[in-house]
Amino acid sequence: MTEPTIKLNYHKTRFLTSAPDIRHLPEDNGIEIAFAGRSNAGKSTALNALTNQKSLARTSKTPGRTQLINLFEVEPQCKLVDLPGYGYAAVPEQMKLQWQKALGEYLQKRDCLAGIVILMDIRHPLKDLDQQMIEWAVSAQLPVLLLLTKADKLSQVARNKTAKMVNEAILPFQGDIQVEIYSALNKIGVDKLSNKLDSWFAPIFQQEGK
């Protein structure tokens, strides 16, 4: 049976809540898709480009500002989750440990998590923590979309070369992993991101018989 094609309007996305840890999140139901990445990978900027809302997700020149788990509702039962950024050295150690704990708990215990978008600066892809995140997602049998962000910083030739390198480097993970080039500034890859999210959200509409 062919899966129905759905097309969600991400421009209607609204902020739902922030939580310091999994215990303060809403009920674990519907479908959630998480956005994860290093503190300077441009997660908030990517979310704002997807939703066409300049300030939906708070951005800052200071990496590491996203200290909470932030939830956004696209439609009832369909949520995007902006996870705390990882790997920023200038953050106090105690705060870093708190973030890592919140991140780990969410990823391990949230049943409605259906996919992970891992964002990496195209100029510095596949750092150790990025690879750990990919490894975890694959072991949890979750599909992964790797977004190579800030693509406007490179020429098209350099972008394609990096994407090819990343595609080759992830083969040993043997998971459901897709690589896309992304630029919030030039709107490169926004449609591919929304199409992937649509496919991950689709089961909720099948359940509801829509």
Curated annotation (Swiss-Prot):
<feature type="binding site">
    <location>
        <begin position="149"/>
        <end position="152"/>
    </location>
    <ligand>
        <name>GTP</name>
    </ligand>
</feature>
<dbReference type="Pfam" id="PF01926">
    <property type="entry name" value="MMR_HSR1"/>
</dbReference>
<feature type="binding site">
    <location>
        <begin position="64"/>
        <end position="68"/>
    </location>
    <ligand>
        <name>GTP</name>
    </ligand>
</feature>
<keyword id="KW-0132">Cell division</keyword>
<keyword id="KW-0131">Cell cycle</keyword>
<dbReference type="InterPro" id="IPR019987">
    <property type="entry name" value="GTP-bd_ribosome_bio_YsxC"/>
</dbReference>
<keyword id="KW-0460">Magnesium</keyword>
<comment type="similarity">
    <text>Belongs to the TRAFAC class TrmE-Era-EngA-EngB-Septin-like GTPase superfamily. EngB GTPase family.</text>
</comment>
<feature type="binding site">
    <location>
        <begin position="181"/>
        <end position="184"/>
    </location>
    <ligand>
        <name>GTP</name>
    </ligand>
</feature>
<dbReference type="GO" id="GO:0005829">
    <property type="term" value="C:cytosol"/>
</dbReference>
<dbReference type="GO" id="GO:0005525">
    <property type="term" value="F:GTP binding"/>
</dbReference>
<keyword id="KW-0717">Septation</keyword>
<comment type="function">
    <text>Necessary for normal cell division and for the maintenance of normal septation.</text>
</comment>
<keyword id="KW-0479">Metal-binding</keyword>
<feature type="binding site">
    <location>
        <position position="66"/>
    </location>
    <ligand>
        <name>Mg(2+)</name>
    </ligand>
</feature>
<protein>
    <recommendedName>
        <fullName>Probable GTP-binding protein EngB</fullName>
    </recommendedName>
</protein>
<keyword id="KW-0342">GTP-binding</keyword>
<dbReference type="InterPro" id="IPR006073">
    <property type="entry name" value="GTP-bd"/>
</dbReference>
<dbReference type="InterPro" id="IPR027417">
    <property type="entry name" value="P-loop_NTPase"/>
</dbReference>
<keyword id="KW-0547">Nucleotide-binding</keyword>
<dbReference type="GO" id="GO:0000917">
    <property type="term" value="P:division septum assembly"/>
</dbReference>
<dbReference type="GO" id="GO:0046872">
    <property type="term" value="F:metal ion binding"/>
</dbReference>
<feature type="binding site">
    <location>
        <begin position="82"/>
        <end position="85"/>
    </location>
    <ligand>
        <name>GTP</name>
    </ligand>
</feature>
<feature type="binding site">
    <location>
        <position position="44"/>
    </location>
    <ligand>
        <name>Mg(2+)</name>
    </ligand>
</feature>
<feature type="binding site">
    <location>
        <begin position="37"/>
        <end position="44"/>
    </location>
    <ligand>
        <name>GTP</name>
    </ligand>
</feature>
<feature type="domain" description="EngB-type G">
    <location>
        <begin position="29"/>
        <end position="203"/>
    </location>
</feature>
<dbReference type="InterPro" id="IPR030393">
    <property type="entry name" value="G_ENGB_dom"/>
</dbReference>
